[in-house]
Swiss-Prot record:
EC main group: hydrolase
Protein keywords: Cytoplasm, Hydrolase, Metal-binding, Nucleotide-binding
GO CC, alphabetical: cytoplasm
Binding site for a divalent metal cation: D10, D11, S43, N99
Role according to the record: Nucleotidase that shows phosphatase activity on nucleoside 5'-monophosphates.
Native source species: Methanococcus maripaludis (strain C6 / ATCC BAA-1332)
Record protein name field: 5'-nucleotidase SurE
InterPro entries, per database record: SurE, SurE-like_Pase/nucleotidase, SurE-like_sf
Cofactor field: a divalent metal cation
Phylogenetic classification of the source organism: Archaea, Methanobacteriati, Methanobacteriota, Methanomada group, Methanococci
Length: 264
């Protein structure tokens, strides 16, 4: 039976990562693949949704002349409009990516790529998020100035996706992170989230009128424990596959309830 797949991202509808993933998925599977993605770069937007301004959907042509839908909003907006206005139904799968830059650790809540995947899962679709490690922000925010091998990552995502098609989907979201030197033979490791992906840094600067302004930046963390997504990608150079859930309830709920319920 033909699958319905909604393909989204946070790097914008004209990203080469999105195009590579669309082409590989379309060629491999019996699927209707519909692209609904932001008009502009939306990195770091998380699962933000537009409540105070109207949204527009514009049909557009991708680089291979196939059709996509550009949304004047966030990745989450793209999923909402994709489900309710473009497809007018919940797809079988929402696939978000290929993101330029890895999405690792608990900081993934800031990721528009993951935000879209979580929104897809919230609507009842099976969701995957996929990201490719890059070594510098230059590659992430100035796509096209240096070559990035999206096709290898797209094929790795395809191969991982295949593993879950024959089984009941095991969780709400599958988060896939691919090291920048990966091949199709790179080992795949099932991981948990690391605590941190970056060590945050705030740089203060002074404008011509002697007022302070700030840039937020971070330094990659390399020394997370074995078994985490950060360690798998950055140290072992493996593909990381992390199962995620929409339920953010603390794991120690019973202990918490026993300790605190009588205090309220």
């Amino acid at each position: 039976m033909t699958m319905e797949i909604l393909l989204v991202n946070d790097d914008g509808i004209y990203s080469n990562g999105l195009l590579a993933l669309k082409n590989v998925i379309s060629e491999e599977f019996d699927a209707n693949v519909t692209v609904v993605a932001p008009t502009n770069q939306q990195s770091g937007i998380g699962r933000a949704i537009s409540l105070f301004e109207p949204l527009r959907i514009t049909k557009t042509k991708l680089a291979d002349c196939s059709e996509g839908y550009a949304v004047s909003g966030t990745p989450t907006d793209c999923v909402v409009l994709g489900v309710h206005q473009v497809l007018k139904k919940v797809p079988d799968y929402v696939i978000s990516g290929i993101n330029i830059g890895e999405n690792l650790g608990t900081e993934l809540t800031t990721s528009g790529t993951l935000g879209a995947a979580f929104e897809g899962a919230h609507h009842g679709a099976k969701a995957l998020a996929c990201s490719l490690q890059v070594t510098t922000d230059h590659l992430k925010f100035k796509e096209g100035e240096s070559p990035i091998d999206f096709m290898t990552t797209a094929r790795i995502v395809r191969n991982v996706f295949k593993k879950f098609l024959d089984d009941e989907f095991p969780c709400d979201v599958i988060n896939i992170n691919v090291p920048d030197n990966a091949t199709e033979n790179t080992p795949v490791e099932i991981t948990k989230l690391a605590r941190k992906m970056y060590s945050m840094h705030v740089e203060e600067r002074i404008d011509p009128r002697s007022r302070s302004y700030y840039w937020l930046d971070g330094y990659p963390i390399m020394d997370e424990e074995d078994g985490t997504d950060v360690y798998a990608v950055r140290n072992k150079r493996n593909v990381s596959v992390t199962p995620l859930t929409l339920d953010n309830t603390a794991k120690n709920l019973d202990e918490f309830r026993e300790k605190y319920a009588k205090k309220f």
